[in-house]
Amino acid sequence: MTHVLPLAGLAALAAFPAAAGETACWFENGVVVVPAEVLGVAADFILDTATAHTQLAETQAQTAGFEETALTGEVRLAGLNLAGATVAVADLDMRTGALPTPVAGVIGADLLKPYVLDVSFAPCRVRLSLRGRAPRFPARTRLKLTWVAGRPAVDATVSDGEHTITGAFAPGVGADRAIRISDATAHVEGAAKPKELYPYGILEPRLRTLSFGGEVSEDVTGGLIAAEDPQLAGEIGAPFLSRYRLRFDFPAGRLLLAPSR
């Protein structure tokens, strides 16, 4: 599949279109990707509300002449200039290798937190609004957002039929599995290659139910994620969230869900 978005998106960054604060994106291989400019590196970036810190890929950082692993500068995203951004340099080869076009990093929750973020998956569009300036959103469900380990989190319940886990899950538009559970609270017995249960692995165990936003979904693709905080039960990824239109109202502490178009 051929994508023309990167060129169009970067042109939009330079021109600042009338719909300031909004940009086209693309959704493939389970993640949302947006055009952005991070510390002068203009490229495609994964947008992920479940990643705590914004990252620039090691290869792109070296090409741009950066030697440090912790950087500070300007990020341009969806027509907005985000000054004073802290960006970590990281090896992202495993995370970006399966994507059909080069990706230079990850826009994380730290940059998004001051804004209202709207995400639609079909067609894929992202909008950032200042507090109190977001357009009307036809929410069907409103969920409380808390913050755990630098990530937004909502309550959800997952079950394999024998065991049930209820806790705080980070909703991630750049997370590539419907749900991943912290390995501090779950494991898969008898897995021949347990590492393949983690991000970028090939195993896709099925979970019987996921209760989220007042609805129960069955036969959900799952996996594990390395524990980072005992209060974080896991993450809910874009393959599941794409059934909705989303509004992350970070200033108000709410996640709003609307039916997909």
Set out the residue ranges of the language-model regions.
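Bacterial N-terminal signal peptides
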Residues: P6-A15
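Positively charged n-region of N-terminal signal peptides that target proteins for export
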Residues: M1-V4
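Pepsin/retropepsin-fold aspartyl endopeptidases
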Residues: F16-R261
